UniProtKB/Swiss-Prot annotation:
Keywords: mRNA processing, mRNA splicing, Nucleus. Involved in pre-mRNA splicing. Required for the SF3b integrity and prespliceosome assembly. Pfam families: SF3b10 (PF07189). It is found in: Nucleus. This is RDS3 complex subunit 10. The gene is YSF3. One of its GO terms (biological process) is U2-type prespliceosome assembly. One of its GO terms (cellular component) is U2 snRNP. Belongs to the SF3b complex composed of CUS1, HSH49, HSH155, RCP1, RDS3 and RSE1.
């Protein structure tokens, strides 16, 4: 019983610390968006990863790649890209 209470306490702490975990009412789409945003945030936050992404995209500067990753995290950005074409 003590182990179960410990696990519930840890789960509560992790949910407060890592918002992307969600809860019972989190939909699949919300969870996927959280994971995607966490990944993009990690890529733009670590210089080595950012440099790798910049090279793979063919961008001339790391700054352009960082801006693209940050814009990609906003919900309306995909609609903006579709309108641009």
């Amino acid at each position: 019983m003590a182990e179960k209470q410990r696990q519930l306490k840890l789960q509560k702490i992790y949910k407060q610390k890592y918002i992307g975990l969600g809860d019972e009412s989190t939909t699949r789409e919300q969870w996927q968006r959280n994971v995607r945003n966490d990944t993009l945030n990690t890529l733009q936050g670590h210089s080595a990863s950012l440099e790798y992404v910049s090279l793979s995209r063919g961008d001339l500067s790391i700054r352009d790649t960082r801006i693209h990753l940050l814009k990609s995290m906003s919900p309306g950005y995909k609609a903006y890209l579709r309108e641009e074409r």
